[in-house]
């Protein structure tokens, strides 16, 4: 094994190709033929070839088995292969513990458990859709539609989840990640006065207005895929003449004119969610959720 580590670092590959058992065996056979017919071949080269023969195929099979167990996760426990390493809540010493675990999702109604699912993904955002799909499969489509409303905390407030709940015709009393901050009386003071959230957006003209009162027109659209594989549509806006602006140092420090992006669909969901959560029914549901 030491022979295999003595060589100089390999150069960066120009391209990455899938390696299979057959490819390794074919390559080894070619090298073996070259070395066998070469009297000047060094013993070191032959030792390396033996190392490849004895280890590469076996290691590849081991790695393929590990990848199959891993699936779409980034870790798994050797003692419980279905468990994923997750960051636990802080202990009494304020240390975050990384341990193999499962993410359990529980649906309740007036403190009565009506459904539960167990997930390998530590992120709550990615569990809402499969949890409700399992509920629908267990109890039927009509029962899911009878729910009419879903209440959840900010851990579930993603564009994908809002779209899914809208598709299922379920009213979403589901916080987005900045909802609680927006209710803080000092939120605007704490927030940077030149941040995107504090810029005025003109919906009729589809443009932003910068702190100097100049319009930031839309320049183009783009697509972005989230970690969960969900495709988002983004609108991009750009200011003009930032170089001579007296507020530039406070507003924008990078070179060129300031650019910002807006997710129209997500902003639509957030506006609707904000109205729901601040309504009398929404306030009551938020109180009930903490009790449940």
Where in the sequence are the language-model features?
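Anion-binding and metal-coordination hotspots
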Residues: 1-292
């Amino acid at each position: 094994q030491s022979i295999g580590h003595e060589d100089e670092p390999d150069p960066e590959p120009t391209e990455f190709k899938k390696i299979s058992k057959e490819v390794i065996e074919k390559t080894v056979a070619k090298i073996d033929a070259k070395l066998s017919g070469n009297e000047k071949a060094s013993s070191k080269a032959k030792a390396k070839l033996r190392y490849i023969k004895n280890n590469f195929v076996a290691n590849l099979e081991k790695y393929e088995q590990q990848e199959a167990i891993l699936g779409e996760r980034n870790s798994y426990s050797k003692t419980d292969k279905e468990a994923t390493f997750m960051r636990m809540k802080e202990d009494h010493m304020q240390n975050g513990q990384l341990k193999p675990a499962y993410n359990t999702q529980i649906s309740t109604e007036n403190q009565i458990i009506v459904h539960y699912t167990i997930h390998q993904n530590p992120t709550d955002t990615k569990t809402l859709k499969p949890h409700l799909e399992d509920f629908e499969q267990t109890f039927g489509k009509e029962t899911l539609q009878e729910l009419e409303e879903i209440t959840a905390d900010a851990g579930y407030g993603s564009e994908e989840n809002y779209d899914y709940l809208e598709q299922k015709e379920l009213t979403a009393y589901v916080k987005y990640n900045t909802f609680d901050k927006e209710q803080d009386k000092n939120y605007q003071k704490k927030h940077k006065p030149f941040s995107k959230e504090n810029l005025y957006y003109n919906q009729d003209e589809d443009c932003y207005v910068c702190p100097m009162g100049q319009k930031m027109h839309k320049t183009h659209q783009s697509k972005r895929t989230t970690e969960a594989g969900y495709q988002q549509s983004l609108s991009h806006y750009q200011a003009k003449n930032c170089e001579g602006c007296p507020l530039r140092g406070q507003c924008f420090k990078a070179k060129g004119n300031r650019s910002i992006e807006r997710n129209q669909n997500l902003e639509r969901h957030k506006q609707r969610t904000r109205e729901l959560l601040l309504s009398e029914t929404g306030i009551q549901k938020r109180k009930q959720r903490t009790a449940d």
